[in-house]
């Protein structure tokens, strides 16, 4: 590079002050400057006629680029410099060439001005001024710019303006097509489906969110499928290990790399925790392993000095007046039912039972003649779990139950801390998995996944704690959760809209399932179940002079006897209710086996009939256990931003707790107003759940009324046309539902207590028509100018009430004109599938989920839990968490 070229490069690095408003003149100047370069090239090429490549470039017109801009004169200068270097010209000749170019520029500029017409004459003065500027400052002339240097600023500015114009044209094209970006939308959300997200204008032409790898759940699933690296290693490059050098131990028998095959049902364990027992097993097993929900702890390990509930007390035959009144009402209902079905009731049946039981004496059975003796456990040196805990004597052990109603038993008085409860949960699960049937050692837990069944109205804090225990403490590969009612439909093979009634040991849960979703506002949890029936049945037996008068119902052997009697004798079959002779064997620790004979009459039906009179259960409970320490350590879940309770808030649960049931209203107008106001109550529950009802209040609503409440709210909040399907598909499951003829009496009770308005087959059409007319009134109402806002609202409400009364009278007239029972929704109770225990249907449904491909998207791995925490449940749940 010459010295002059170096100096010119220094000038181009400095900022240049060039006016940008004369773009047209500058374009013209570029064309003019290109002409002398071409003429100079003609002169040089005349001397070298053998160079054909240069001849092709020579012309009277400057070639154009793709963008329509003139070819940069510096490119032509580059070619000239190369030719000059090839001829080995010295620096003096280069200086002469530059001077010749200046002369040619002036000559060619004058020639071009003469050839152009009058239209170009108008633009001549600016061009002349520009050429004069280049003469005054020759180093600013683009034609003299050295090769490979910066582009002039006026060209950069022109390109920028071109890009702005292109963006405007692109925006016009998007608007014409209809895919432009809209910041706000005024269209309200309608229907059951959420509106689609607006297109991302930035990435609309790319593959953004169009591949499975760009979706979190699918990307994580693919990673787990193809995971050939150790999860412990944090690097992407696996370590090179010599397999021959590894020790042949049990721990190394597992695959070196923790591969997770999410679609392998043999590597999945299904767990359904219940109040009475835990159902656990592999998905392909015919039946799960049923482990009693019991942990026997030696009394010497516990501080029970200040506990008044330790000693077992006998049931008192004498009860309160309120108890006797409810019992009299139940007996009256029983006699009316027997009379309706033409069953004869002996007048002196109760006297016959009492006289026989008073004179009944026990028969001693020797140990060798006992068909099923019990080997009681007296060794209090360790803990016992499951069925072994049931054989521990009460004098040396305390029975703790870590689960209640599908969640942690925070009401148990025997737990001092949450750590004790979690310890019992982990040890009980390890005991169940280590049984002979499953034979899964704790060291192999990391090779299995878990499908966990949770209640319909679940507590988020309990679910999250349970998942954390399974992933971090027991170290399973992954965990997926499913609600009980949905699992019930899977297990029973029902795909239509269904009302599921699950009668458990401690709780009874009701929920409606529609299109694979548990409807939130239909879920109800009743705080009574099979254990309450057992206790009440034992009390009725004692009031009939049961031979075993010192019966300690709270002792372990006393409770086992009561459970056995309830299972064998309670029934709803009218034909089986008579004065009959029965017998049983009493097995107690340190006592010989005794055989008793006794008689029963209506006690076999009165005890389960309390499902429809549940207030009597509240009167026979010894005390409402409450462990404030555990409730403080495991509080209810709250929103991180608003600090409001964020558990599921069911409208049916709230109304049944407060006693606001449709079946208790005799006026159809009140029922209709309550139904129309349901959406407002739902909004209030979601905004301020603490202000509406006590969450700790127990729910003792009658079973048949709760079912009607659940179906009505499910139909109103989701689709009112589903009401007929819900009444036609009522599925009863649970261990305490195995009472003969329960479906028969439940159908009668629903037909008796269901309001006439809600039982009409024309109610869905009536409700849809009424709501449409109310919306029309609200939309077309014109406020009076001389009235205040409150007065206008009162006028509108008066018109709405008038319309409701008018439509209701028309509905009553239509019902009266119909004949027979064709206008009434039929009630149908679906029996469990043949040869299937109703207590195991929920577990079976969860095992079905574990074998379908959908479960791959629901599994939560340990890495997911570490990174996202409980937020991962919002993305990997089959329901709205």
Swiss-Prot record:
InterPro entries linked: Actin, ATPase_NBD
Q: Which residues bind ATP?
A: 502-505
Q: Which GO biological process categories is it annotated with? A: chromatin remodeling; DNA damage response; DNA repair; double-strand break repair; mitotic recombination; regulation of DNA-templated transcription
Q: Which UniProt keywords apply?
A: ATP-binding, Cytoplasm, Cytoskeleton, Nucleotide-binding, Nucleus, Phosphoprotein, Transcription, Transcription regulation
Residue ranges, compositional bias (Acidic residues): 14-33, 44-54, 77-114
Q: Give one Pfam family.
A: Actin
Superkingdom as given in the UniProt entry: Eukaryota
Residue ranges, annotated region (Disordered): 1-150
Q: Which residues carry this modification: Phosphoserine?
A: 65, 70
SUPFAM superfamilies per UniProt: Actin-like ATPase domain
Record-linked Gene3D superfamilies:
3.30.420.40, 3.30.420.580, Actin, Chain A, domain 4 (3.90.640.10)
Enumerate the subcellular locations listed in this protein's record, separating them with semicolons: Nucleus; Cytoplasm, Cytoskeleton
Q: Does the UniProt entry include the keyword Membrane?
A: no
* The keyword DNA repair is assigned to this record: no
Q: GO CC terms on record?
A: cytoplasm; cytoskeleton; Ino80 complex; nucleus
What's an example of a GO molecular-function annotation for this chain? Answer: mRNA binding
Q: What else is known?
A: Present with 1010 molecules/cell in log phase SD medium.
Q: Which family does it belong to?
A: Belongs to the actin family.
Q: How does it assemble?
A: Component of the chromatin-remodeling INO80 complex, at least composed of ARP4, ARP5, ARP8, RVB1, RVB2, TAF14, NHP10, IES1, IES3, IES4, IES6, ACT1, IES2, IES5 and INO80. Exists as monomers and dimers, but the dimer is most probably the biologically relevant form required for stable interactions with histones that exploits the twofold symmetry of the nucleosome core.
Q: Which function does this protein serve?
A: Probably involved in transcription regulation via its interaction with the INO80 complex, a chromatin remodeling complex. Exhibits low basal ATPase activity, and unable to polymerize. Strongly prefer nucleosomes and H3-H4 tetramers over H2A-H2B dimers, suggesting it may act as a nucleosome recognition module within the complex.
Q: What is this protein called?
A: Actin-like protein ARP8
Q: Which organism is it from?
A: Saccharomyces cerevisiae (strain ATCC 204508 / S288c) (Baker's yeast)
What is the name of the gene encoding this protein?
ARP8
């Amino acid at each position: 590079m010459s010295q002059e070229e170096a100096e010119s490069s220094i000038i181009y690095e400095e900022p240049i002050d060039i006016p940008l408003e004369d773009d047209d003149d500058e374009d013209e100047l570029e064309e003019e400057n290109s002409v002398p370069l071409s003429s100079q090239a003609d002169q040089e090429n005349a001397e070298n006629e053998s160079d054909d490549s240069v001849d092709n470039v020579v012309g009277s017109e400057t070639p154009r680029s793709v963008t329509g801009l003139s070819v940069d004169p510096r490119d032509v200068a580059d070619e000239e410099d190369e030719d000059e270097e090839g001829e080995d010209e010295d620096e003096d000749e280069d200086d002469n060439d530059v001077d010749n170019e200046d002369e040619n520029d002036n000559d060619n500029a004058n020639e071009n001005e003469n050839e152009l017409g009058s239209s170009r004459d108008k633009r001549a003065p600016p061009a002349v001024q520009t050429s004069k500027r280049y003469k005054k400052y020759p180093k600013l002339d683009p034609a003299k710019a050295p090769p490979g240097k910066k582009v002039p600023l006026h060209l950069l500015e022109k390109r920028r303006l071109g890009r702005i114009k292109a963006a405007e044209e692109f925006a016009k094209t998007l608007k014409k097509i209809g895919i432009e970006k809209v910041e706000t939308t005024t269209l309200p959300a309608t229907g059951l489906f959420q509106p689609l997200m607006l297109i991302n204008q930035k990435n609309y032409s790319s593959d953004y969110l169009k591949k499975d790898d760009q979706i979190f759940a699918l990307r994580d699933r693919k990673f787990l499928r193809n995971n050939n690296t150790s999860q412990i290693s944090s690097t992407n490059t696996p370590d090179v290990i010599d397999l021959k050098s590894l020790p042949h131990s049990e721990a190394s028998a597992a695959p070196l790399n923790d591969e997770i095959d999410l679609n392998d049902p043999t590597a999945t364990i299904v767990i359904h925790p219940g109040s009475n027992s835990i159902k656990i097993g592999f998905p392909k097993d015919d039946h799960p392993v049923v482990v009693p929900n019991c942990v026997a702890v030696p009394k010497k390990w516990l501080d029970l000095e200040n506990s008044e509930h330790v000693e077992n007390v006998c049931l008192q035959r004498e009860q309160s007046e309120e108890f006797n009144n409810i019992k009299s009402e139940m007996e009256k209902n029983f006699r009316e039912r027997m009379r309706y079905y033409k069953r004869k009731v002996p007048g002196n049946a109760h006297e016959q039972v009492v006289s026989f039981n008073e004179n009944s004496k026990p028969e001693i059975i020797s140990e060798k003649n006992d068909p099923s003796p019990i080997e009681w456990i007296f060794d209090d040196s360790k803990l016992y779990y499951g069925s072994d805990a049931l054989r521990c004597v009460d004098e040396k052990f305390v029975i703790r139950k870590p689960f209640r109603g599908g969640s942690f038993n925070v009401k148990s008085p025997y737990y001092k801390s949450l750590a004790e409860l979690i310890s019992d949960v982990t040890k009980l699960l390890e005991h169940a998995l280590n049984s002979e049937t499953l034979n899964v050692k704790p060291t192999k837990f990391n090779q299995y996944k878990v499908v966990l069944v949770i209640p319909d109205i679940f507590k988020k804090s309990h679910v999250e704690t349970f998942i954390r225990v399974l992933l971090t403490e027991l170290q399973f590969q992954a965990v997926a959760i499913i609600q009980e009612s949905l699992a019930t439909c899977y297990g029973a093979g029902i795909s239509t809209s269904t009302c599921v009634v699950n009668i458990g040991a401690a709780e009874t849960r009701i929920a409606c399932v529609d299109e694979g979703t548990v409807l939130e506002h239909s879920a109800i949890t009743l705080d009574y179940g099979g254990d309450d029936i057992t206790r009440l049945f034992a009390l009725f037996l004692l009031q009939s002079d049961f031979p075993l008068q010192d019966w300690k119902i709270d002792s372990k052997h006393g409770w086992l006897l009561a459970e056995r009697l309830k299972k064998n004798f309670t029934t709803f079959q009218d034909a089986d209710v008579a004065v009959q002779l029965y017998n049983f064997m009493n097995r107690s620790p340190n006592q010989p086996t005794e055989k008793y004979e006794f008689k029963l009459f209506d006690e076999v039906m009165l005890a389960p009939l309390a499902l429809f009179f549940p207030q009597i259960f509240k009167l026979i409970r010894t005390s409402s256990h409450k462990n404030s320490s555990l409730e403080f350590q495991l509080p209810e879940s709250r929103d991180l931003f608003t600090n409001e309770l964020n558990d599921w808030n069911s409208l049916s649960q709230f109304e049944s707790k407060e006693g606001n049931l449709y079946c208790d209203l005799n006026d159809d107008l009140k029922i209709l107003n309550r139904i129309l106001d349901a959406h407002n109550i739902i909004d209030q529950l979601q905004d301020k759940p603490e202000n509406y009802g006590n969450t700790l209040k127990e729910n003792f609503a009658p079973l048949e009324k709760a079912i009607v409440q659940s179906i009505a709210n499910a139909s109103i909040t989701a689709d009112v046309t589903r009401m007929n399907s819900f009444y036609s598909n009522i599925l009863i499951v649970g261990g305490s539902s195995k009472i003969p003829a329960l479906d028969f009496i439940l159908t009668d009770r629903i037909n008796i207590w269901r309001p006439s308005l809600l039982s009409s087959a024309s109610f869905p059409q009536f409700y849809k028509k009424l709501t449409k007319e109310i919306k029309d009134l609200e939309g077309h109402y014109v406020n009076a100018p001389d009235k205040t806002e409150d007065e206008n609202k009162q006028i509108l409400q008066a018109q709405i009430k008038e319309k409701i009364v008018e439509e209701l009278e028309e509905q009553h007239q239509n019902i009266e004109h119909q004949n027979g029972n064709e206008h009434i929704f039929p009630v149908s109770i679906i029996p469990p599938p043949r040869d299937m225990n109703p207590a195991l249907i929920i577990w079976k449904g969860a095992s079905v989920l574990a074998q379908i491909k959908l479960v791959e998207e629901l599994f939560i791995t340990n890495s997911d839990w570490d990174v996202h925490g409980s937020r991962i449940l919002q993305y990997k749940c089959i329901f709205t968490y």
